[in-house]
Amino acid sequence: MKLVDEAEIEVFAGNGGNGCIGFRREKFIPLGGPDGGDGGAGGSVYIRADENLNTLVDFRHDRIFKAQRGENGMGRQAYGKGGEDLTITVPVGTVVINVATDEVIGDLTQHGDRLLVAKGGRGGLGNMHFKSSTNRSPRQALPGEPGEERTLKLELKLLADVGLLGFPNAGKSTLIRAVSAATPKVADYPFTTLYPNLGVVKVENYRSFVIADIPGLIEGAADGAGLGAQFLRHLQRTRLLLHLVDISPMEGGVEGISPVEQVRAIERELEKHDPELLRKPRWLVLNKADLMFEDEAKAAAEQIVAELGWKEPWFLVSALGREGTFPIMSRIMAFFDRQKEEEQEARNAQ
C-alpha cells in the first residue's frame, strides 16, 4: 500500500570566508609586500538516501539545515579552512523538489544516492592577488560569496509495513492513534474510517515503521459489500497483518457477532479475495479489554485463542487506554529486524 509522506525543509549552504588584507612583516623586512590569504569555501548541503530509514517523520520538527561557513583568510598567505559539508539522510525513494520553481532536483532511488542541493559560497580573494606594477601595497580583498539557500519539498511514497484488519468498530483507528502521530476520526459507529489512514510508529533509536488503518471489513467485502472491496488490495503489499477483534461482551460483540466468528468471517473474505493473504504473517490483537474485569478479559482471550486454534502471536490490549500497545510495536520492530537479517543471509547465500 503506497501513500505519500511529505515534508518541507530549508537548506543553507555556508558562506565563503573573507579574503585577508595583510602584509609581510618580518625582521629586516619592515615593508614587505601583501600576503593576505584567501577565505575558505563554504560547506555545501547534500541529501543522501539511506535504506535504514523509511519515513520522513523526523522532518516534522527539524526543518532548517545549515552547512558550516568558510573561515577567513589570514596573513602569510594562509588560506581559511573550508566549511564542513552537511549531509541530510532520507529514505530510499525520496523525491527532492525545489519549492520556488517546482522543479524536481533529484529522485533518490538507490541506497547511497547523493544529491547536491545547495552549493557553498567560494572564498574571497586575499590582497596578495591584487598586487600590480602600479599598486605594490593593495589594501583590497574580496568578501566570500554567499552560499545557496533553498526551500525544498521532500516527497516519499510510503509502503505500509503493517496493515490493520478488523470489523468496523474493532478499534483500529483508536490503536493507530495510540501508537503513532496519526489522528484518524474515531467514533462509535461503523465505517468511521472511509479512507486508509497512515501512521508512523517510532520505536527506539529513531527507527520507525508505517502502519495502515484499512477501513473496516464485513462479510461480503470481497464481493463489494461495505467499504472493504476497494481496500482489500491494499493489504497485499504489507509485511505483517494485525487482526483486531473486539472481545467485549456488550451485545455479544461487534454487531452481535462473537469474537471467534469475527475472525472467521474476515478469514473467509481474505480467502475469497486472495488466498495468499491468509499465508501472510498475521497476529491477533484482542481489544477493548478495559470493558471487562482483568481476570474475565484474560479468561475470554484464552478461550478465543483456544477455539480458533491460534498458533501465531496474540495480544490482549486496550487501545483506548494504551494498555499493552507499545509492547506490540516493539515486537513488530524486532520481527522486521529478523526479516531483514534473513533476507540478507539469503542474498549472501546466492
Curated annotation (Swiss-Prot):
Its EC number is 3.6.5.-. CDD domains: Obg. Keywords: Cytoplasm, GTP-binding, Hydrolase, Magnesium, Metal-binding, Nucleotide-binding. Pfam families: GTP1_OBG (PF01018), MMR_HSR1 (PF01926). It is found in: Cytoplasm. Disulfide bonds: none annotated. One of its GO terms (cellular component) is cytoplasm. Its cofactor is Mg(2+). The keyword Membrane does not apply. GO terms for molecular function: GTP binding; GTPase activity; magnesium ion binding. InterPro entries: G_OBG, GTP-bd, GTP-bd_Obg/CgtA, GTP1-OBG_CS, GTP1_OBG_dom, GTP1_OBG_dom_sf, OBG_GTPase, P-loop_NTPase. Residues 160-337 form the OBG-type G domain. The keyword Magnesium applies. Mg(2+) binds at S173, T193. GO terms for biological process: ribosome biogenesis. Residues 126-147 are annotated as: Disordered. NCBIfam families: Obg_CgtA, PRK12297.1, PRK12299.1. HAMAP family: GTPase_Obg. Belongs to the TRAFAC class OBG-HflX-like GTPase superfamily. OBG GTPase family. Monomer. This is GTPase Obg. It comes from Stenotrophomonas maltophilia (strain K279a).
